[in-house]
UniProtKB/Swiss-Prot annotation:
Protein name, entry field: Halocyntin
Functional summary from the UniProt entry: Has strong antibacterial activity against the Gram-positive bacteria M.luteus, S.aureus, B.megaterium, A.viridans and E.faecalis, and against the Gram-negative bacterium K.pneumoniae. Has less potent antibacterial activity against the Gram-negative bacteria E.coli DH5alpha, S.typhimurium, P.aeruginosa, E.aerogenes and N.gonorrhoeae. Has moderate hemolytic activity against sheep erythrocytes.
Record keywords, A-Z: Antibiotic, Antimicrobial, Cytolysis, Hemolysis
One GO BP: hemolysis in another organism
Source species of the chain: Halocynthia papillosa
Superkingdom to which the source organism belongs: Eukaryota
Length: 26
């Protein structure tokens, strides 16, 4: 159960980080 939550959190964090990097570069 917690593994699924942790994976979701990591996925959202990675997406947010990627979005921030993409926004900074563009």
């Amino acid at each position: 159960f917690w593994g699924h939550i942790w994976n979701a959190v990591k996925r959202v964090g990675a997406n947010a980080l990627h979005g921030a990097v993409t926004g900074a570069l563009s």
